[in-house]
């Protein structure tokens, strides 16, 4: 009875391990990272465009009645977007690195569990073989004694 109970617990652990592994390696979890990278790219492009326009306003290439105010606004918004894009890029890189580390740790843990399960199985098989050998020796010695 104990052997059956231990076997069912081992099967539950295997099922839990497989579910965790599938959840960690699911590529749909990486979708927010792609969206964040797209937002960072758009913000960077917009910031560079605003900074170029502001530079053209300041240099006088583009004429506007309120060129200094418009140029200051473009510089401010462009710098804000560029800073936001920089911070967003750093945070996205950090999130991707953390996710990859988590995946590699999960894979290593899964490999360790599989190796441990194989060793446990070999040990239980060896102990079962030893018990059957002992029984066989006992039965042979009893037959030899009679």
UniProtKB/Swiss-Prot annotation:
Pfam families recorded: IncD (PF17628)
Disulfide bonds: none
Triggers of expression: Cotranscribed with incE, incF and incG within 2 hours after internalization.
Recorded topology in the membrane: Multi-pass membrane protein
Main location class: secreted
GO CC terms of this entry: extracellular region; host cell membrane; pathogen-containing vacuole membrane
Keywords: Host membrane, Membrane, Secreted, Transmembrane, Transmembrane helix, Virulence
Xref: InterPro entries: IncD
Intracellular or extracellular location(s): Secreted; Host vacuole, Host pathogen-containing vacuole, Host pathogen-containing vacuole membrane
Positions of transmembrane segments: 38-58, 68-88
Function field: Host inclusion membrane protein probably involved in early modification events of the chlamydial inclusion.
Protein name per the record: Inclusion membrane protein D
């Amino acid at each position: 009875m104990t052997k059956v109970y231990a076997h069912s617990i081992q099967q539950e652990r295997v099922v839990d391990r497989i579910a965790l592994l599938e959840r960690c390696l699911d590529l749909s979890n990486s979708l927010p990272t792609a969206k964040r990278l797209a937002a960072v790219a758009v913000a960077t492009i917009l910031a560079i465009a605003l900074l170029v326009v502001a530079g053209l306003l300041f240099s006088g290439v583009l004429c506007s009645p309120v060129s200094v105010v418009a140029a200051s606004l473009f510089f401010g918004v462009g710098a804000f977007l560029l800073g936001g894009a920089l911070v967003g890029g750093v945070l996205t890189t950090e999130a991707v690195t953390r996710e990859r580390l988590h995946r590699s740790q999960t894979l290593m843990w899964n490999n360790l569990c599989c190796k441990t399960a194989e060793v446990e199985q070999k040990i239980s098989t060896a102990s079962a073989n030893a018990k059957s050998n002992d029984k066989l020796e006992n039965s042979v010695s009893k037959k030899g004694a009679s």
